[in-house]
Amino acid sequence: MCCRFLLCYDDSLMSALPFHPIVAEWFTTRFASATNVQMQAWPAIQSGRDVLISAPTGSGKTLAAFLSCIDTLFQQAVRCELRDETQVLYVSPLKALSNDVQKNLQQPLSEIGQAALASGMLLPELRVVVRTGDTPMTERQQMLRRPPHILITTPESLFILLTAEKSRAMLKTVRTVIVDEIHAVAPNKRGAHLALSLERVASLTGVEVQRIGLSATQRPIETIAKFLVGNRNPSIVNGHTSCEAVSRKPLAISSAPCTIIDVGHRRDMDLAVEVPKDELGAVATNAIWSDIYDRVAALVEAHRSTLVFVNTRRLAERVSHYLEERLRHLGDEVVAAHHGSLSRTIRLSAEDRLKTGAVRVVVATASLELGIDVGTVDLVCQIGSPRSIATGLQRIGRAGHWIHAIPKGRLFATTRDELIECAALIRAIRAGVLDRIEVPPAPLDVLAQQIVAAAATQSWDEAELYDLCRRAMPYRDLDRSTFDAVVTMLADGYVTSRGRGRAYLHHDRINHHIRGRRGARLAAITSGGAIPDTANYAVIAEPDGTVVGSVDEDFAVESLAGDIILLGNTSWRIKGVGTGKMRVEDAQGAPPTIPFWRGEAPARTAELSAEVARLKADIDHRLGAGQALSAGSAPPVQWLRQECGLDQRGAQQAVEYILAGKAVLGAVPTQQ
């Protein structure tokens, strides 16, 4: 069922919005109605309590969070109380999402400012700045000289900002933190790292900073709420709005420290599994791949804008290259690639062209998976299984990224196992099954980084630093002996094969104080974060010296001058490989070799694995003992077509696969 929305128009909408009249008027001129999630979120946010918003893609979550913050800043400007200080901190797990949010904020800020000027109010500009690893040094320096009112960053850059001396001072005035796509970081070490950084922000400001979490897919939602607010034993208010509800009253606000706005994750979706003409096997043949490229190209031509997701950067380059060959008749540069090993310039260009419709199709990895505005994409293709239910929902939700739209997704199976997995995924999505999020308990490597960073900025009482760490939800059960052991290791140094490593802390065991040694701050800034280091070589285009992207170290050292490689859907001829750098020149479309990157493919989640096992068991049950398959007449075939988005050929191949496995093994493997 689709989530229903409040239908408020004109004066009735104006009066319903809890904003300054100019801000409210801007909203009514831009939108015909406010969504249900927005009408519930705004009073909750303006109450000052922590808020977690869980809603489908395209339901207006980001605007729900930001418009209240913009209204607060605007009203300060009206009262001549707006200072040149950072009050709103927005954290997203992707640099692409950070850049996109900045662009999407510039327009409302500009239009609200123009509306104020038209009303006779000359107000200071509300400034928004992005600070990530891609931010040029000049912009970083300008930000320190004149802090933005809204700062957009990533978890890793927030850690650096908290640790560097000058930027740290800028964060003392933060009053609201917005964590977008919180489900993407909560179940891994990046989440633990961010949770500690949020507690350091709260400690730095000396006040209770309001926290707003945004996510599209979460289960259990109470765990994510606790992750957001930290270890304060919150009593969670569940403002659940079921998708089947015809209408809902605005959320009743209570005195609880965290409010959950949950309008569910289920939407009507147009889902199907695409099966190649040749019969699928254990591995994909060249003929199968060729048929997949042909079918994707045909779908691209039949739609205005298409987003193709793959699971690896190598496959992104490969698919974009072969689609380019098949779609050349549509014009030049109608296909673009997008992944984390491309330069910022190339990624931003692909994002802009996708949003404006300048390209017909973009082939991407997880780099475009989260809430970036992808414009009017009306089809998402997934090559192979996305390996998790949440990822499948998130990626397919990129299509129809506007209110009331029905996302359209096509999953392309490349093997028999992927056929079953894709069918199980569609069945799970239709049934409302979600992956379960589990927060990793107290990763000590992350704890050590944050202790060094915190001690590098000021002297700490041991007990106070221990309490700060335990306020972060992943460390709520951290015992004192473990904390002391980590501190001792950092203060005494640790033994390696080359001898004892350097110590980062001064530990006063008499007065129980901790402070950083010389070099601790630099070590924290240069070595912090939970994203694994990779030995990549920068790819530099000559003669202008433009950075095109990066390739894996092993690929770089195996390459020779004169080789042609593909990066960003462009052929490059290698001129030379040096220390950490690969110099290239435009190869003018010559046939290329596709680079590889190590350690890319995602693992399958436990929930999707359970759905795969359940589907196999259900097919076996419907076949009946000893029943043979003949010309698609087996009972499960029609059931698979209705339940799992398979066509006749795909359903028949799925049944044949189960029968063949049972004939060899004597039983259908399940999790029982």
Model-derived segments and spans:
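Cysteine-centered motifs
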Residues: 2-3, 8, 243
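Helicase motor core with emphasis on the C-terminal RecA-like subdomain
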Residues: 13-15, 19-25, 33, 39, ...
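Detector for the N-terminal beta1/A-loop initiation region of ABC nucleotide-binding domains
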Residues: 30
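Walker A (P-loop) phosphate-binding loop of ABC-type ATPase nucleotide-binding domains
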Residues: 56
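ATP-binding Walker
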Residues: 59-60
